[in-house]
Amino acid sequence: MTAHTALDGLTVLERGWLSSNNILIHAAAGEPGAVLVDTGHVSHAEQTVALVRHALLGERLHRIVNTHLHSDHCGGNAALQRAFGAPITVPPGNADAVASWDTMRLTHATTGQSSERFTHADTLSPGAHVVAGGRRWEALAAPGHDPFSLMLFDARHGVLISADALWENGFGVVFPEIDGEPGFDDVGAVFDAIERLPVSVVIPGHGAPFTDVAAALARARSRLDGFKSQPERHARHAVKVMIKYHVMEERRIGHDALLQWAAATPFLLAAWRLFGGGTPPREWCARFVDELIGQGVLAREGDQVIDR
């Protein structure tokens, strides 16, 4: 996308899929410093610190705000806190889990992901706002992908930081559905809420900023309808996403070690209990590894599975 004037004063560090995008909102005159939204994966933490330091150009990092606390959005928190001393703001529903560092409630342990403990200074509730870059960013509830997830909306310029609630081509895995809780209707309600907003440009959690919001919503709704009509399709997608994500984190892993990880990961086991059909969990997970290799998303070299 050609640079949009609504993004003036923002630096979007587009990362990929293992790490979320990092959005640096540069300080306007009279503000105490820049605000960073989301910090990527822990395995990229040193790179994130370097990227943020370069983008700051000597400016002070005043605060870090997390849209939600999945491992790909908060993994750089601790490293950035050490490097810049910036306080961290989290959604209120996550505050107790952060304070006690309950990795099960944070979903890092349930999804088999790595994380580094950090401390938070305060919370940002839906309906509250953050002033950064001379803009008023309203926090909007965005449950579905994560029950406590937030979006940030600058109504004056029409900029929506959507996290994983909406990408240009899809949206994040609806984790509650695998845990036996409703989530699809929440996702649809968030789409409806986005449609009612005067959005000119979306900064997603993954992928480049985009302006054709109507087309993105149409694609997302079509995908959601497919998942609602065939919940097993969503579960299969979720399992493959998590396996791919783990291999991205490891870069290369033994086939047996990957299956051992998969068959012991609570989130994948929850999907297996719903749709495994009596197949042993290790064998069931092996099918998804084979599918990912067949699709060219992963590769097999001897006994090693490698990212592609």
Model-predicted regions and their roles:
Residues I25, D38, H68, L80, ...:
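Divalent metal-coordination and catalytic microenvironments
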Residues H41-A132:
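Active-site HxH/HxHxD metal-binding segment of metal-dependent hydrolases
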Residues A235-R308:
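C-terminal regulatory/interaction regions
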